[in-house]
């Protein structure tokens, strides 16, 4: 058996098209333009690429894009003052502070200074708590993208066994909460889990978000399972740098029913869900119905 390849790039394009339709409807029906502000401190090369991609896609779906690029030596007080201005700016519906921040800045303090209603990354402690207690929240983008693909592929997730390998605040924990919200039976596995392969083999849904290249092999996969690979790792192979996931695609694809590739799987969904979250935040701020299917 060879697994179905879940094309995240194509799925993300569909999400962006849906967001663009809803943005056009907001403009025509209500004169409202959703706005996303992205804050970058310093000159980290990867962060600069991400911020550029976010700004480009924001404009492509018809939203207003506000980029704030600050020098690496920006003080905490200066950054917090900018966030306060953005919190009170009615043209800004979503705010994203690009991580990682320079070492002298307290990331938790900065993130928790955001207006939770504008926290489109879903990292504010209020949104974390709301997600954990089943209340309406802003949902972290990568887990939301995974959930969208799972819903599309499987339909109902109720009653399925799900194993999330990884317990980070950014992916593992919120992914487990989202799956629990779909009435899955959820196990969170990690570096201290005993007999990890056996735990994973019990999963109808296996989400790998552990940050170790090709750690999850076909031996970890239940026949017919759906495998979502969140990992993005750069490795040297045959004298070349290659991007691989946390799953060994070749062996896992021989066992799984469906699997996301790396690259081209979960990655493209992250920015698409950032745009979806900005749209959701805009609708909530204006007391308008949220578009269906674009949030948890």
UniProtKB/Swiss-Prot annotation:
<comment type="function">
    <text>Catalyzes the oxidation of 5,10-methylenetetrahydrofolate to 5,10-methenyltetrahydrofolate and then the hydrolysis of 5,10-methenyltetrahydrofolate to 10-formyltetrahydrofolate.</text>
</comment>
<comment type="pathway">
    <text>One-carbon metabolism; tetrahydrofolate interconversion.</text>
</comment>
<keyword id="KW-0554">One-carbon metabolism</keyword>
<dbReference type="GO" id="GO:0009086">
    <property type="term" value="P:methionine biosynthetic process"/>
</dbReference>
<protein>
    <recommendedName>
        <fullName>Bifunctional protein FolD</fullName>
        <ecNumber>1.5.1.5</ecNumber>
        <ecNumber>3.5.4.9</ecNumber>
    </recommendedName>
</protein>
<keyword id="KW-0658">Purine biosynthesis</keyword>
<keyword id="KW-0486">Methionine biosynthesis</keyword>
<dbReference type="Pfam" id="PF00763">
    <property type="entry name" value="THF_DHG_CYH"/>
</dbReference>
<keyword id="KW-0378">Hydrolase</keyword>
<feature type="binding site">
    <location>
        <position position="191"/>
    </location>
    <ligand>
        <name>NADP(+)</name>
    </ligand>
</feature>
<dbReference type="GO" id="GO:0000105">
    <property type="term" value="P:L-histidine biosynthetic process"/>
</dbReference>
<comment type="subunit">
    <text>Homodimer.</text>
</comment>
<dbReference type="InterPro" id="IPR020867">
    <property type="entry name" value="THF_DH/CycHdrlase_CS"/>
</dbReference>
<dbReference type="GO" id="GO:0006164">
    <property type="term" value="P:purine nucleotide biosynthetic process"/>
</dbReference>
<keyword id="KW-0511">Multifunctional enzyme</keyword>
<feature type="binding site">
    <location>
        <begin position="166"/>
        <end position="168"/>
    </location>
    <ligand>
        <name>NADP(+)</name>
    </ligand>
</feature>
<dbReference type="InterPro" id="IPR000672">
    <property type="entry name" value="THF_DH/CycHdrlase"/>
</dbReference>
<dbReference type="GO" id="GO:0005829">
    <property type="term" value="C:cytosol"/>
</dbReference>
<dbReference type="InterPro" id="IPR020630">
    <property type="entry name" value="THF_DH/CycHdrlase_cat_dom"/>
</dbReference>
<dbReference type="GO" id="GO:0004488">
    <property type="term" value="F:methylenetetrahydrofolate dehydrogenase (NADP+) activity"/>
</dbReference>
<dbReference type="InterPro" id="IPR036291">
    <property type="entry name" value="NAD(P)-bd_dom_sf"/>
</dbReference>
<comment type="similarity">
    <text>Belongs to the tetrahydrofolate dehydrogenase/cyclohydrolase family.</text>
</comment>
<keyword id="KW-0368">Histidine biosynthesis</keyword>
<keyword id="KW-0521">NADP</keyword>
<dbReference type="GO" id="GO:0004477">
    <property type="term" value="F:methenyltetrahydrofolate cyclohydrolase activity"/>
</dbReference>
<dbReference type="InterPro" id="IPR046346">
    <property type="entry name" value="Aminoacid_DH-like_N_sf"/>
</dbReference>
<keyword id="KW-0560">Oxidoreductase</keyword>
<keyword id="KW-0028">Amino-acid biosynthesis</keyword>
<dbReference type="Pfam" id="PF02882">
    <property type="entry name" value="THF_DHG_CYH_C"/>
</dbReference>
<dbReference type="GO" id="GO:0035999">
    <property type="term" value="P:tetrahydrofolate interconversion"/>
</dbReference>
<dbReference type="InterPro" id="IPR020631">
    <property type="entry name" value="THF_DH/CycHdrlase_NAD-bd_dom"/>
</dbReference>
<feature type="binding site">
    <location>
        <position position="232"/>
    </location>
    <ligand>
        <name>NADP(+)</name>
    </ligand>
</feature>
């Amino acid at each position: 058996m060879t697994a179905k390849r879940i094309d995240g790039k194509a799925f993300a394009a569909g999400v962006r098209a849906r967001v663009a339709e809803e943005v056009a409807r907001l403009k025509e029906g209500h004169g409202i333009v959703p706005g996303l502000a992205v804050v970058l401190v310093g000159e980290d090369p990867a962060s600069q690429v991400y911020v550029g991609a976010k700004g480009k896609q924001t404009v492509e779906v018809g939203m207003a894009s506000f980029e704030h690029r600050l020098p690496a030596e920006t003080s905490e007080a200066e950054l917090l003052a900018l966030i306060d201005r953005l919190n009170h700016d009615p043209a800004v519906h979503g705010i994203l502070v690009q991580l990682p921040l320079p070492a002298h800045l307290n990331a938790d303090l900065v993130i928790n200074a955001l207006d939770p209603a504008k926290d489109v990354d879903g990292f504010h402690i209020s949104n974390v708590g709301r997600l954990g207690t089943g209340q309406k929240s802003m949902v972290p983008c990568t887990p939301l993208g995974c959930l969208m693909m799972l819903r599309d592929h499987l339909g109902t997730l109720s009653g399925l066994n799900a194993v999330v390998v990884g317990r980070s605040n950014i992916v593992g924990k919120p992914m487990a909460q989202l799956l629990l919200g779909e009435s899955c039976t959820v196990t969170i596995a990690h570096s201290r889990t005993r007999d990890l392969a056996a735990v994973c083999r019990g999963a109808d849904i296996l989400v790998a978000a552990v940050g170790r290249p090709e750690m999850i092999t076909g031996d970890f996969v239940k026949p017919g399972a759906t495998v979502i690979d969140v990992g993005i790792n750069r490795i040297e192979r045959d004298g070349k740098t290659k991007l691989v996931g946390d799953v060994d695609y070749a062996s896992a694809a021989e066992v799984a029913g469906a699997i996301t590739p790396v690259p081209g799987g979960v990655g493209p969904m992250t920015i698409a869900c950032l745009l979806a979250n900005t749209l959701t935040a805009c609708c909530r701020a204006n007391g308008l119905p949220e578009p269906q299917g674009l949030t948890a």
